[in-house]
Amino acid sequence: MSKKKPQQSSNTIARNKKARHEYFLEDKFEAGVSLQGWEIKSIRAGKVNISDSYVIIKNGEAYLLGAEIQPLNQASSHVYCEPDRSRKLLLKRRELDKLIGASEREGYSIVATTIYWKGPWAKLEIFLAQGKKSHDKRDTIKERDWQRQKARIMKHSVR
């Protein structure tokens, strides 16, 4: 008998599923996040929401806005916990320059899609994204439905 490997839990903490529906995701970047102690504890407990989050560039630095990290009930009373504060993103200069140049173009924005663990550090997956128009969203939905229907037809035709 072979030994069973212990199941590894997923490193993903939270996802922004709405981003794939709202944007054409183009370039992917991995950024570290500058967090306080209570935020790390809350993230470990899974009390994070990045569904409406986005990245802005201010004074040559990237900041995450709209991410909500709820403080734990056991949080220290001498520290003021602000769930909606802006958090600095840690990127290499070359990546930051690329984001600055691209975000200044018309119709492009920087969207956070996933927050996950990489070793002991919380990392944020961000994309350079272009907004979809409503007809693009409808086309995406039609294509997805057609793929589902095609798979269903192929499954039944094999029998």
From Swiss-Prot:
Record InterPro entries: SmpB, SsrA-bd_prot, SsrA-bd_prot_CS
A GO term from the CC aspect: cytosol
Alphabetized Gene3D superfamilies for the sequence: 2.40.280.10
Name of the featured protein: SsrA-binding protein
Subcellular location: Cytoplasm
CDD domains assigned: SmpB
Main localization category: cytoplasm
Highest classification ranks of the organism: Bacteria, Pseudomonadati, Pseudomonadota, Gammaproteobacteria, Alteromonadales
